[in-house]
Amino acid sequence: MTQPQKADEKPRFFRDEDESVINLNESRSLFVQDEADDSDDGQGHVESSSEVSSNTSNHKERFFESLKEILGENMISSSQLHTLWSSYGLLKDGISIAADKFFEDKELLSKSKTESKMPAGDNIEVIDLSDEENDDELSILPSSSQLSQLFTNKRTSTQAGLESPMSSDKGRNRWSRYIGSIHTMGFATRPTVKPVPIGSRLGFKKSVPKDLPLGKSLQHQHCSHLVRLIDTSQDRELGRMPEDVARILYPLLDYSEQVSLEPYLLINNGKRFSVGDNIYIRIDCYLTSQAFVRIEGGSILNKSFINDHGMDTRQLHRAGAIMALFDAINIQPVYGDTKNEMIPNYQENTVSSSQFQDEALNINQLKSFYRITQSAASLQNLPETTPDESLFKLQLRRYQKQSLSWMLKREYEYSHLSEKAAEVSIDGNSMNPLWKKFRWPSNSKQGTPNHEDDCFFYANLYTGEFSIEKPVIKTIINGGILADEMGLGKTISALALICTASYDEAHEKKIESTKKPSMKEMSSQVDSSPLRHSQHKHDTYAYRTTLIVVPMSLLNQWQSEFEKANKDLKKRCEIYYGNNIKDLRAYVLGPNAPSVIITTYGIIQSEYGRTSTSGLFNVVFFRIILDEGHTIRNRSTRTSKAVIALRSSRKWILTGTPIINRLDDLFSLVQFLNLEPWSHINYWKRYVSVPFEKGNYAQAFDVINAVLEPVLLRRTKNMKDVDGKPLVSLPPKEVIVEKLQLSSSEKRVYQSMLEDAENSVKEGLAKGDLLKNYTNILVHILRLRQVCCHLDLLKKTPDLGDPDLEDLENSTQNISSILMPKNIKSPKSSISQDKLDALSANFRDIHSASEQLPSFECAICTTECIEPLSAVSITECLHTFCEPCLAEYIEFQQNKKLSINCPYCRMPISEANVLKLKEPIDAERGYELISFHSHFQSTKIKALLRHLKQIQETSPGEQIIVFSQFSSFLDILEIELRSHLPRDQVIIYKFDGRLDMKERTRILEQFHDKDLSCIKLLLLSLKTGGVGLNLTCASRAFMMDPWWSPGMEDQAIDRIHRIGQQQTVKVVRFIIDNSVEEKMLRIQERKRMLGDIVEGDEAERRQKRIEEIQMLFQ
């Protein structure tokens, strides 16, 4: 026992910094003093027994009651009260000294806790954190074993009462269940006169204003001052909560009947709280019966807000707070075993390199998205349906039979399914994708509502709604998305569907039933019935016609495929150009309606908005199929709006790439399919676009997966069937990168262009306005790529449709001034016209005119009969050589810095003075020589010619594809190849976006016809050739220039390497060494590793492109 405190010492109750508070509140002292004490002499001596007056017993009672008020009745026992009275009861400020002593004496404090009224079995550990620095700790503390076990019994005792049915409300039992706890650290704002007991039940109160102004986002408000932590035993403020926790609590305090939040003091160091002290608390969270809604027939989805104002501000804040609460208590949704394995971890980056750490969502995660739909559809176990042989000519592969079953089910055409397939029906009541399934914590299992499955509950964290029953959404659309990888035969699958179910049988039966009505029906009033109305002259349902919408290049291919597949002569296919059928509406509603109408996206766009009553928009088709459906991905384009405005009872989308650049690419597909409510843009933005733009990829893709799971089917070439065999067996594919060296003249031009580009990038980086110079930089890169292809491209102003300039449409800069033609100087010949005439005369004398053209021999490779004659190079000494041989010899001598002499006679020659025969070449009229450099030949064209001549010698009859992105380069290639290859041995076709439909059809038909006597060469635009074409007749391809995205090139190659290909596919990619093209390959490899970037918005797309540009100049 310590000595009594001297009377003149200040009682230790508040910290020194709070003394001012005490002085200001002396009139409101917390301690009750006896009036007799005021006359005390201040020495603090103990009164003798002779001075004890008759009011001593009252003084003792006041002493006991004051200590109980300060310390709490449950914190101090009767024996302790008497001990403190006997030592300090008669001292001045004895109550204050006794309270100090109570907390300073460890033995007394321990004895107090042992004797206090606590539940049986409680074992409370006191953790002394008085000397720890906690200022930098996280506001929400991690749950350790020590924290989670602390006060377990106390929570259980409290919880037990809450789990029991609550007071009856209009005859209904009310209940609540524990879902988790938040461990957090608040801070004291008021001093306490005594320590708050560990495990004390605290409370929360909201400060005014109760609501934020309408439209205010809680994310931009400070909430810590709006939520007060209350000591319920004293009904006074104890402290405040950290900002992130307060932001959760603030909206939920208005909904305490639905979400119960119970704070308990978690840790105390045995001292009273002073201003600024840390307060460690645990907030136990409960859901009550009032939080749950009854879901009937998916009505909850109809209740969900479709526009931005469907929920008031309080509801929006509540929904956000509940989502944050579930994150804080770390309660996770429950998935099925398979699906749980397939859920991608969108936040985890599998690439260790630091330069890739800030990448946006990538194609690897898109593959995970596809895998989820594939897994959910149980692809390997899908039943098979074989089309009727009397209706369909072709033999389907196994996976195509499965897709036919799936498509028939999506249209609810069960009568056409095989017996086995018909046994498995489609579940039209899939779980609402906004809702998630959660498991009740195991320690709250008792006293649950009386349901079959009381282990789970369902929550819509986007709206803050809860349900005990599974919330479902009925999928009522007839159709879906067939997203098989390119080359797996989506066209054949769609044609099998058309031939199997070519018309609306149910509608036809209704029509038949109205043709011969009974007497009873005739006498009844049925004029307003749907059946009578369907026979009205204004009926627009073409129930026997499927409309197929395709890119123009595929128009005739689809018609040809239909003719190959269809075996029913009653079924017809028509192509609709817009003006070839005078009255489309009357045609498809008439008795001779075609089974299939094929048209293009362009025709639909041109008819959109017209007032005609006979076009596409005045008919409700039986079925609409969009081939290359990603064409409508941009919802703001006229084409997309037009296609979405088409009407039918069944809708299908065929695309190998549902997502191209943005997650919002899917919205137009969803809108076309009428997937309610996702087809409303505000709904889509709220649950998909906005979360994705904010970096919450998991949330956005979680919704997308759930939305598309029932309506999307995708298979890839690498997948295997139930027997472990690949879905398709394709021949090998070889892709070879051939690096080329620029010629000396090309190098000079390239280096000049490169310096300009680097200066522009460095200037932008130095000024910090690289994005402002975006247009300039793209043009510089375009010019560098053009140099790598052909110098003549620099003499032309590129069309803004070129791939590199597709992002410049909205530029405010004067693009024309940037793209001014460049003066590219070729090596200037020193031969005058008179000398040239003299050399021509001498050449004619050496090679006398005759009926047959002479055979020129190359003195380097000794090839006799150089063909064509346009490939003959002639020196000043009039010796002839192959153009590639002489060019290679001159370049070798220049690189070695050796003198250039004629390989035949050793006479000095000059690159600038090399000659060639002037075209047209006519031996009867005599030869005329011109300077070779009047027509420049690029390094890539030389390499291509070398390969083509080898193929010509070893594989006559080969069909070859030459890809390029630049239409102007295809023009140059056509001229060069025609002039250097014998016309009777090589046939050249050119296919790009400038051709009309008839020309495209003619070229493809002629190219497909194999001719063993000659090579057929198709010059193909990468953009045009990457869409839908079937080019399996060819097995060799050359890629003349690279593109940013490897996917674009892969799509083009897949036009060749697909079902129907019988030979090994060989692809050669020409890349200029140590150039911008070589660095583009690195970017492609980077994208293959990380995946093609899916950006949130246009600014992010541009920022990613700038990062790629910086890589080009590193």
UniProtKB/Swiss-Prot annotation:
Residues 471-676 form the Helicase ATP-binding domain. The keyword Nucleotide-binding applies. The keyword Hydrolase applies. One of its GO terms (biological process) is DNA repair. Residues 943-1114 form the Helicase C-terminal domain. It is found in: Cytoplasm; Nucleus. It comes from the Eukaryota. Probable helicase, member of the UBC2/RAD6 epistasis group. Functions with DNA repair protein RAD18 in error-free postreplication DNA repair. Involved in the maintenance of wild-type rates of instability of simple repetitive sequences such as poly(GT) repeats. Seems to be involved in maintaining a balance which acts in favor of error-prone non-homologous joining during DNA double-strand breaks repairs. Belongs to the SNF2/RAD54 helicase family. This is DNA repair protein RAD5. It comes from Kluyveromyces lactis (strain ATCC 8585 / CBS 2359 / DSM 70799 / NBRC 1267 / NRRL Y-1140 / WM37) (Yeast). The lineage of its organism: Eukaryota, Fungi, Dikarya, Ascomycota, Saccharomycotina. The gene is RAD5.
